[in-house]
Amino acid sequence: MMNRVVLVGRLTKDPELRYTPAGVAVATFTLAVNRTFTNQQGEREADFINCVVWRKPAENVANFLKKGSMAGVDGRVQTRNYEGNDGKRVYVTEIVAESVQFLEPRNSNGGGGNNYQSGNNNNNYNSGGNNFGQAPTNNGGFGQDQQQSQNQNYQSTNNDPFASDGKPIDISDDDLPF
């Protein structure tokens, strides 16, 4: 059986950090995730999903994310229950995050460019940057010095054969594959 959830959204409020009696950090936050379709008025609706993360990644989430920060969460769905003050059984369904990725630069709306992963019962975490498709760097994964020097040597070339041609493109419906 499989229980896997991957979400990308924005925090609806600052994360709440608490510690268990044993001293284990736990952070809770709510992620607003847009639906892939629009309603009858043409507006996108959002789902508000409760998430929980444990140990060192919980402290990092509390320190680096805030209301409005974009984050990616990889984890599993869990339902727990407890007896409420009125004596009735209360059920709570939430996402237990195994990995939280900060999807915005540190100087923007919030967060950092880090990816923190919590193991099942250990305190290991990875601090790599968002180096998608890039070779690893020796500066904690942030690659800013390298990126700045690459941008200085970059010259923009326009390889579009149809750019500024001025002539209309003659394509009939029979030429289209759909």
Curated annotation (Swiss-Prot):
Pfam family of the protein (one): SSB
GO aspect biological process, one term: DNA repair
Keyword Transit peptide annotated: no
Keywords: DNA damage, DNA recombination, DNA repair, DNA replication, DNA-binding
Residue ranges with Low complexity bias: 115-129, 144-160
An example Gene Ontology CC term for this record: nucleoid
Important for interaction with partner proteins, short sequence motif: residues: 173-178
The keyword DNA-binding belongs to this UniProt entry's keyword annotation: yes
Region (Disordered): 103-178
Signal sequence, renumbered to the chain: none
GO molecular function: enzyme activator activity; single-stranded DNA binding
Membrane spanning stretches: none
Domain SSB: 2-104
Classification via InterPro entries: NA-bd_OB-fold, Primosome_PriB/ssb, ssDNA-bd
Subunit structure: Homotetramer.
Record function comment: Plays an important role in DNA replication, recombination and repair. Binds to ssDNA and to an array of partner proteins to recruit them to their sites of action during DNA metabolism.
UniProt protein name: Single-stranded DNA-binding protein 1
Species this protein is from: Listeria monocytogenes serovar 1/2a (strain ATCC BAA-679 / EGD-e)
Gene from which the chain derives: ssb1
